[in-house]
C-alpha cells in the first residue's frame, strides 16, 4: 500500500481509513491503529479512525468513552511526533445511544481531533429483517441507511463545536439526498454505495444539477 500511495498525484485530496485486524486481541487494538498511522500518515490529507466497522468483532465497543479516549490520546500524541500532520476524523456507528454520541462529541470538542464522519453502515436488526437480510453478515448501506444516518447527523450537529469538520455519508444517490446532508449540518459529503450502483458519473450529475453548489463555500480538508 505504501508503494502505491507514494505514486499518487498529491494534487488530489486523499483520505486513509485505519482500524484493527479482526483477530487482534482487545489489549492490542491501540497498537494496530498506531502502526497503520505511522506507516501511512505522510501520504494522507486526513486519517479516519474507524471505530465502527460492523465486520470487525467488538469494534463498536470503542464507542465506550474510556476506550475511545485512550485511542484518540495515543493517536494525537503520535501525530505530534511527525512533521506531516493530517487531519484526524472519527468514523461513527449509526446504532449507538444518544448518550454515547454526547460523550464522544464532548470529548472531541475538548481535543485536537478535527472532526467526525457520520456514519458507517447500520446493523439495525429490525431493518435487516424488513429487508430479509438478517441472516447475512455485515451492515446495511445505501438508501436504506439514509434515515438513520441523517438522524445521527442532526443530533451530532447540535452538540459538536463549529470548529470541527462534519463529513456525512449514507444514502447519497442524487442531488436531493446530497443537499439534505448539508441542510442537516454537514461540511462535506462522501459517497460509497451510490458510486457502485450509479458509477462515477453520479458525482458529475450532482455537481452539474445542483444550483446551490458554490466553490467558494466548500470546506477544505486537505493538509
Enumerate the predicted regions with their spans.
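Catalytic cores of alpha/beta
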Residues: 31, 96-110, 157-162, 172-189
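Hydrophobic faces of well-ordered beta-strands that scaffold small-molecule active sites
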Residues: 1, 14-18, 47-50, 88-92, ...
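C-terminal helical cap(s) of enzyme catalytic domains, especially alpha/beta-barrels
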Residues: 125-142, 182, 188, 193-223
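Alpha-helix-loop-beta-strand connector modules within alpha/beta enzyme cores
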Residues: 2-11, 64-88, 135-164, 206-219
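Active-site beta-loop-alpha junctions enriched in small/polar residues
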Residues: 19-23, 52-54, 91-95, 119-123, ...
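Active-site glycine- and acidic-residue-rich loops that bind
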Residues: 21-34, 61-67, 89-110
Amino acid at each position: 500500500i505504501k508503494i502505491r500511495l507514494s505514486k499518487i498525484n498529491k494534487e488530489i485530496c486523499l483520505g486513509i481509513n485505519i482500524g484493527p485486524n479482526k483477530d487482534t486481541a482487545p489489549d492490542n487494538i491501540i497498537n494496530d491503529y498506531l502502526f497503520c498511522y505511522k506507516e501511512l500518515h505522510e501520504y494522507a490529507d486526513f486519517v479516519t479512525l474507524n471505530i465502527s466497522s460492523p465486520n470487525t468483532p467488538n469494534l463498536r465497543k470503542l464507542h465506550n468513552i474510556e476506550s475511545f479516549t485512550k485511542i484518540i490520546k495515543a493517536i494525537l500524541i503520535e501525530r505530534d511526533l511527525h512533521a506531516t500532520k493530517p487531519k484526524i476524523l472519527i468514523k461513527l456507528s449509526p446504532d449507538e445511544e444518544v448518550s454515547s454520541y454526547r460523550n464522544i462529541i464532548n470529548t472531541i470538542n475538548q481535543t485536537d481531533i478535527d472532526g467526525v464522519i457520520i456514519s458507517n453502515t447500520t446493523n439495525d436488526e429490525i431493518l435487516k429483517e424488513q429487508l430479509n437480510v438478517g441472516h447475512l453478515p455485515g451492515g446495511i448501506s445505501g438508501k436504506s441507511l439514509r434515515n438513520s444516518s441523517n438522524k445521527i447527523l442532526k443530533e451530532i450537529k447540535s452538540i459538536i463545536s463549529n470548529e470541527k469538520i462534519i463529513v456525512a455519508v449514507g444514502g447519497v444517490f442524487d442531488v436531493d439526498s446530497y443537499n439534505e446532508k448539508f441542510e442537516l449540518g454537514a461540511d462535506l459529503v462522501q459517497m460509497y454505495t451510490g458510486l457502485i450502483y450509479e458509477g462515477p458519473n453520479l458525482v458529475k450529475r450532482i455537481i452539474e444539477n445542483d444550483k446551490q453548489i458554490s466553490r467558494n463555500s466548500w470546506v477544505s480538508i486537505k493538509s
